[in-house]
Regions:
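Short histidine-centered beta-strand/loop micro-motifs
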Residues: 32, 50-57, 74-75, 83-85, ...
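Short acidic-glycine-tyrosine-enriched beta hairpin
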Residues: 76-96
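Residue-level recognition of conserved beta-strand positions in structured domain cores
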Residues: 42, 74-76, 96, 104, ...
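Short, charged/polar surface micro-motifs in flexible loops or helix N-caps
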Residues: 36-38, 45-49, 67-71, 78, ...
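Short, conserved beta-strand element in jelly-roll/cupin
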Residues: 57-72, 76, 113
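A short, N-terminal "cap"/entry segment at the start of jelly-roll beta-barrel domains
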Residues: 1-53
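Double-stranded beta-helix
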Residues: 2-9, 101-126
């Protein structure tokens, strides 16, 4: 495959590195790999992720909702949470170092643009 050939976005991850280079690699089961730059990946989520939140120390995360709807739950400075519905056609920015999670009530196709390589997860809900 040449360097300018398209790849199937449903099956691949795009890494946009801080040094200005990029590459693609096939998706693997489980969480996405972490790169020194941004990981761009597309998922169709059918259920709420099992962890109780994550945060990114390297920058803001961008969510682009392609279809469906979900709720972004962000921790607030006063110890509470803020819930924001995000729908097909919406872009939503999660600020750097903000604990957040998604609640999925219907299938939701989202493109994630995630800074890396640092990411932290809280424990499993339940």
């Amino acid at each position: 495959m040449g360097s300018h050939d398209p790849v199937g976005f449903a099956d691949n991850i795009v890494a946009l590195l801080r040094d200005g280079t990029s590459f693609t690699q096939p998706k693997q089961p489980g969480s996405s790999p972490r790169f020194d730059g941004f990981t761009v990946v597309s998922y169709v989520l059918t259920e709420t992720p099992p962890h109780d939140g994550e945060r990114h120390a390297d920058g803001d995360e961008l969510l682009l909702v392609i279809s469906g709807e979900c709720v972004a739950v962000l921790d607030t400075a006063d110890g509470g949470t803020e819930e924001t519905p995000i729908r097909a056609g919406d872009a939503f920015v999660i600020p750097k170092n903000t604990w957040h999670r998604l609640v999925i009530d219907e299938p939701c196709h989202i493109v994630f643009v995630t800074p890396g390589p640092q990411m932290e997860h809280r424990g499993l809900r339940g």
